[in-house]
Each structure stands twice: as C-alpha cells, then as structure tokens.
UniProtKB/Swiss-Prot annotation:
<dbReference type="GO" id="GO:0008137">
    <property type="term" value="F:NADH dehydrogenase (ubiquinone) activity"/>
</dbReference>
<feature type="transmembrane region" description="Helical">
    <location>
        <begin position="386"/>
        <end position="406"/>
    </location>
</feature>
<comment type="similarity">
    <text>Belongs to the complex I subunit 2 family.</text>
</comment>
<comment type="function">
    <text>NDH-1 shuttles electrons from NADH, via FMN and iron-sulfur (Fe-S) centers, to quinones in the respiratory chain. The immediate electron acceptor for the enzyme in this species is believed to be a menaquinone. Couples the redox reaction to proton translocation (for every two electrons transferred, four hydrogen ions are translocated across the cytoplasmic membrane), and thus conserves the redox energy in a proton gradient.</text>
</comment>
<dbReference type="GO" id="GO:0042773">
    <property type="term" value="P:ATP synthesis coupled electron transport"/>
</dbReference>
<feature type="transmembrane region" description="Helical">
    <location>
        <begin position="168"/>
        <end position="188"/>
    </location>
</feature>
<keyword id="KW-0520">NAD</keyword>
<feature type="transmembrane region" description="Helical">
    <location>
        <begin position="321"/>
        <end position="341"/>
    </location>
</feature>
<keyword id="KW-1003">Cell membrane</keyword>
<keyword id="KW-0472">Membrane</keyword>
<dbReference type="GO" id="GO:0005886">
    <property type="term" value="C:plasma membrane"/>
</dbReference>
<protein>
    <recommendedName>
        <fullName>NADH-quinone oxidoreductase subunit N</fullName>
        <ecNumber>7.1.1.-</ecNumber>
    </recommendedName>
</protein>
<feature type="transmembrane region" description="Helical">
    <location>
        <begin position="424"/>
        <end position="444"/>
    </location>
</feature>
<feature type="transmembrane region" description="Helical">
    <location>
        <begin position="79"/>
        <end position="99"/>
    </location>
</feature>
<keyword id="KW-1278">Translocase</keyword>
<dbReference type="InterPro" id="IPR010096">
    <property type="entry name" value="NADH-Q_OxRdtase_suN/2"/>
</dbReference>
<keyword id="KW-1133">Transmembrane helix</keyword>
Amino acid sequence: MDFETLLSYEWGVMMPEFIILGVAVALSLIDLFMPENRNRQLLGLFAFVGIAVSFVSLLSLWTSDVTSILGDTFRLDSFAKSFKALLLIGSALVLLLSIHYEPKERIAYRGEFYYLFLTALLGAMMMASSGDLITLFVGLELLSISSYILVAIRKKHTLANEAALKYVITGSIATAITLFGMSYIFGFTGSTNIKEIAVQLASTSDENHQYVLSLAFLLTFVGLSFKLASAPFHMWAPDVYQGATTPVVSFLSVVSKTAGFVIVLRVIVSVFAQTPAGSSASMLMTFAPYIAFLSGATMIIGNTIALRQRNVKRMLAYSSVAHAGYVLVAFASLSMFMFEAIWFYLLAYVFMTIGAFAILQVVSQHPDDEDISIFAGLYRRSPLMAIAMTIFLLSLAGIPGTAGFIGKMNIFLGAFVVEPAHYVLASIMVITTIISYVYYFGIFVQMFFRPVEHTHRLEWPPGVIAVVVICVIGTVLLGVFPNIAYDFLAPFQHFSDFLQ
C-alpha cells in the first residue's frame, strides 16, 4: 500500500476513534512525567473532554452515507453510528464517577486507570465499525485486556485480585472458543471480510457443509455469550462485580455489555442471516429457538438468584444477567424492529444502571461495605437521592412511566409480531419481570421504611450529582417521550444499510 493510496482514504470517518486514541496516548505521556504526589484528577477531566469531543465528531458524521475504508475492514454505517453513541454516552458518565471515586478510598490517583479506560472504549468502538473478523477480534481484545487490568487495578485488594483472576480465566476461555468458531468460518470461505463471507455462505447448498457452519455458529455464539454474561455463562459476573471498584463495575455492566451485543449483531446477524440451513430457513432462523431457550434461562436464573443476594453489587450483577436475557428476547424474535428495540433498551439501561451505581458509590462509605442495609433510612439522610434511586429501581423493574418500561414493552411486542409468535418467551419475560420487583423493592423498603443506621452526613461530589441528574432526566424523559430517542434514529431508516 503506497502513500498515495493511504491519502485517498476518507480518514475523517475514523475521527471519533482517532480522538480517543490521541487522548489515551497523551494521558499516558503526561502521567509518565507527572510527579507521583500530583493529583491525577485533571487526567480524568482531560479524558472526559476527549470523550465529549469524540461524541461531537460522531454527530458531525451522523447523516453521512455508508463509508468503508482500508479494504472494508472499517465501515461507518447506521449501526456503527448509533451504537458508538451509546458507548460514548455510557463511558462519559462512568468517567465522571471515576474522577470522584479514588479520594474516598484515600489512595493516590492512578493515571493508568484513565488511559486503560479509553483503550477499552477504543476497542468497543472498533467493534462497532468492524467490517472484518480480524478488526473485530482486535477490538475485542483491546476491550478485554484493558478490562482485566481495570478490575485488578487495586493490586493489594484481595477481592479485586480474586475477581481479576476469575475474569481473566473465563475471558480467555471465551476468547478461545470465539476464535475457534471464527476459524471455521475463515476455513470454509477463505476470507475474513464479513461482507464476502456473507455472500459466499448465502450460496452454500451442500448439506455436509451445514454441520461445519452449525458448529461455527454455536462456537462463536457460546464464546460471545460469556461477554454478555448470559446463563449459563454468567458465573464470573457476581464475583467480578463484587471485587471491582464501582466505576469499573459500571463500565462492565453498561459499556462492555453493549459492546458484547455489538459484536453478536455484527458477526451472527451479518454472517448467518442469509446462510441457508435446509428448507427455506436461514441458519439464524434455525437456531432462533436455541437462542430463545438461552434467553429464557438467562431471565429465570438472573432474577431468581438475585432474590437471595444481600450484597448490592452481587444483586445488580444478577440483575445485569437478567437484563441480558431481556435483550436476547429481541435477538431471538428477529423482528424487523430488532435493532431499534435493542438500541433503545441499551440506552435506557445506560441511564438507569449508571445512576444506580452512582448512588451506591456514595452510600457505600467503605469499598467492602455493600450490604443492602447501607440504604437504610436514606430518605431521611438524603431525600432527593432516595427519590432518584427509586426512579432508577422503578426503571430497572420496568414500571410504566420510565425508560425501562418502554424498552421492555418494545421487546415484548416484538416477540408477538413475528411468525410464529414467541408466546412462551414473552410469558417468561413478564413473570421474571414481576419476580424482579421483590429484590428491587427490597432496596426501596430499606430507604423509606427502615431506621437510619448511620447518622454521618453523606458527601455528594459534583461529578456524582451531575451523573445522577443526567440519568434521572434520561430515565424519565425516555419513559414519557420515547420518540425523542427514535427521532435520533430517523435518518437510519430501520438500519437498512446493515447488510449492504
């Protein structure tokens, strides 16, 4: 590839990624030359500004046509734009939490947190725009390796070390399984380009090849299910959530999970949606019942085990497992509005989950003090924050008037509009949602109907207050006026360019 060819590419489509990369490199150099006793909070603010500028650059590309560069290894389509917006919004909110987290632990600011955070975000954004299995895998590893280190960033903390070890082991196994599945796809087609793979597989008719492709589908989907923390591949989540810091848990719960669904949609839908699997059904349609079974099991296991949890982080970990099941309902239904339903639900999930973790971060005065009883009497100590937490819990539970309700309703209706309708899956969704009321309202009871155990005044840093306010506004606004979000997607025409 000569210099003139490089100059001919439209590098502007990668501007959001270039900004994140540049800020991450700059932060690493600044941190290297800063005195050890200097406060690293400014690095966090610099990282936040970088994410904001990257988001603005993404908005400037919002109405641009589909563009691919570097041999179609990087493509900017409606799917990439919409999901990168989710990743940037979630990352910006988590970063505000992290800036005000470390002083509470009375440890020095560690600058590496911020550029590792940005590196993980960069990997997730690359996954959203990947048009090639190699680019997709590089993005996945950028996200995964950075996440492993972020979980273990408290090197002398026993629970953090245990969580990081479990995360590395399960994550490595998941990566190996995913790569094994992708190797079958490459071996069959001789290409790593997703578009070329889809074209070749669409013309496959030999029944002997169906077994190989079915194995590739199962291996790839099982490996990626670890990233989603869907049952039965969720066992790492509770321990990792309990051992990691609250900002890192927020990142894993929101940004990393969103990236997981991004790669599932990019690989599974792009490659297997048009691959024949006997009769007139595609391979994706053939495996839809298995995905539906996995979705139902994830909703049941996540919500029922959460009932037994006293540790709030472990409770929210199992809640996160259940929410992965809800999103998988949309994936199993394969309705024409699948992308919009998944995108809206993940947007609602960003606001209600990060908001809940923001309040937990302040209420939990000690890193290991995360029992549900820490919320006792919160309404008397901080009425506004108790009301805000109630809004987040209501949204997580799917109560009308909140963004969570609209997200669940869209997915629920999507399960009915397809042929054949997924009545059983929709019923499981309703029943498990009702079950979730028990453990969500357990926190509600602690806040409003239990006596105050701690009388000391809660300190609410400006960054945390900003996160809570933004999340409350987002949760309520999307619950009352959901068309605001859908109007945001109007230029994309139901993601019609996804398979082009």
